Swiss-Prot record:
Principal location listed in the UniProt entry: membrane
Reactions it catalyzes: ATP + protein L-histidine = ADP + protein N-phospho-L-histidine
Name listed for the protein in its UniProt record: Nisin biosynthesis sensor protein NisK
Group of enzyme by EC: transferase
Keyword vocabulary terms for this entry: ATP-binding, Cell membrane, Kinase, Membrane, Nucleotide-binding, Phosphoprotein, Transferase, Transmembrane, Transmembrane helix, Two-component regulatory system
Membrane topology: Multi-pass membrane protein
Length: 447
């Protein structure tokens, strides 16, 4: 690539192009004027006086001499004052006649009628102090106005041409920036790294290419880390589940023997603990699978079918937890985009959390669905204690717990999973305490 230059210099180059073009345009106008005068298409501004020295001049002699001058004229007979010849416009005849009758020059504005005579003839010349077209048809257009219009149009074309090339060059550079920006972070090999003659754009392009490669490397490294994490959690789950399975079998064997009431309580407690552990590791596996999930999150989903399938599971859970469950649909939306499996699992996790912390004795949990121009909202509310400020800020984090309040009995894997699903759907998880009391979790996704 040739020599590079700054953006300021490129703009000044465009300005200089316009200035040089303007000077050339002026020279063109001067040359055009000189050429038209040479071929007799416009009259000059100088005043001439025709001399009729000889009384032997004929009309033909006068007409032959007048062909050398770009002026209108009329030849009068001195005896009869009749027009014997000439080159003129009928509308100017009264002025010619007035000059003949007065035997003097007369001036009307910028036009002078010059009187000359001998014994037989009188000649009146029409001369304009300003250049004008000698062609009677074109004379209605002022030559000065013609030059102004010519200069104005030429200047506009010149400016448009110069600005167009400037904008075109800038546009080409912006398109190069857009091209790399749209592929930022993708692992791709550019056939040829684009360069710019403008220093500022070239620096931006080089920086974007460099950052794109770095980002692609980091994304790929993170993807490998997620694969490793998924494998490690799966291996850990298998390693832990094996002794738990053995322990579960031993407990079942103990149940088959004769045990007293206290021993039966111990066995029941161990079974509950095993169930908690099993659920805990299953949730961990689900969370790591979500991190490593490459499934499509843009599938078209029927909202009605989705709610029907979801309600079946939520109603079963509400029966298990002895909760008064309500479904409230506040939208006319028919379809949306997302991943059915991930979304239903996230809502079930939130629903279970709401059931566990609803008000004892009269548990109420509701699921409300509504939307706006960009997002679809799934709002799950219960009538339990409100979230603490710490929980509202951190409940979506993995392994979050606090000593008191809503998170005192569990870890935040369920809500962390829901937060991950929301982010996959270009949304967010919102925890709030409404004015009507209780607590609510809103899963917001892009429609």
């Amino acid at each position: 690539m040739g020599k590079k230059y700054s953006m300021r210099r490129r703009i000044w180059q465009a300005v200089i192009e316009i200035i040089i073009g303007t000077c050339l345009l002026i020279l063109l106008l001067l040359g055009l004027t000189f050429f038209l005068r040479q071929i007799g298409q416009i009259s000059g501004s100088e005043t001439i006086r025709l001399s009729l020295d000889s009384d032997n001049l004929t009309i033909s002699d006068i007409e032959r001499d007048m062909k050398h001058y770009p002026y209108d004229y009329i030849i009068f007979d001195n005896d009869t004052s009749k027009i014997l010849g000439g080159h003129y416009v009928k509308s100017d005849v009264p002025s010619f006649v007035a000059s003949k009758q007065s035997s003097h020059n007369i001036t009307e504005g910028e036009i002078t009628y010059t009187y000359s005579s001998n014994k037989h003839f009188s000649v009146v010349l029409r001369q304009n102090s300003m250049p004008e077209f000698t062609n009677h048809t074109l004379r209605s257009i002022s030559y000065n106005q013609f030059t102004y219009l010519f200069f104005f149009l030429g200047e506009i074309i010149l400016i448009i041409f110069s600005v167009y090339h400037l904008i075109r060059e800038f546009s080409k550079n912006f398109q190069a920036v857009q091209k790399i920006a749209l592929k930022m972070g993708e692992i791709t090999t550019f056939p040829e790294q684009e360069e710019s003659k403008i220093i500022e754009f070239d620096q931006v392009l080089n920086n974007l290419y460099s950052k794109s490669k770095e980002l692609a490397f980091l994304i790929e490294a993170e993807r490998h880390e997620k694969h490793d994490l998924s494998f490690q959690v799966a291996a850990l789950s298998h390693d832990v589940k094996t002794p738990l399975t053995v322990l579960k079998g031993n407990i079942e064997l103990l149940e088959m023997t004769e045990v007293n009431e206290q021993q039966a309580d111990f066995i029941e407690s161990m079974k509950n603990s095993l169930t908690v552990f099993d659920k805990y590791f299953n949730t961990m596996i689900s969370y790591t699978k979500l991190l490593n999930d490459e499934n499509d999150y843009k599938a078209t989903i029927s909202l009605e079918d989705f709610l029907i399938d979801l309600s079946v599971e939520l109603e079963e859970l509400s029966t298990t937890y002895q909760v008064d469950y309500q479904l409230v649909k506040k939208t006319d939306l028919t379809t949306f985009y997302g991943n059915t499996l991930a979304l239903s699992r996230a809502l079930i996790n939130i629903f279970v959390n709401a059931c566990q912390y609803a008000k004892e004795g009269e548990k109420i949990v509701s699921l409300s669905i509504y939307d706006d121009e960009k997002y679809l909202y799934f709002e799950i509310w219960n009538n339990g204690h409100p979230f603490s400020e710490q929980a509202k800020k951190n409940a979506g984090k993995l392994f979050f717990t606090e000593d008191t309040g809503r998170s005192g009995k569990h870890y935040g894997i369920g809500l962390s999973f829901a937060q991950g699903v929301a982010l996959k759907h270009q949304g967010n998880l919102i925890l709030s305490n409404p004015q009507k009391g209780g607590a609510e979790v809103i899963l917001k996704i892009k429609k």
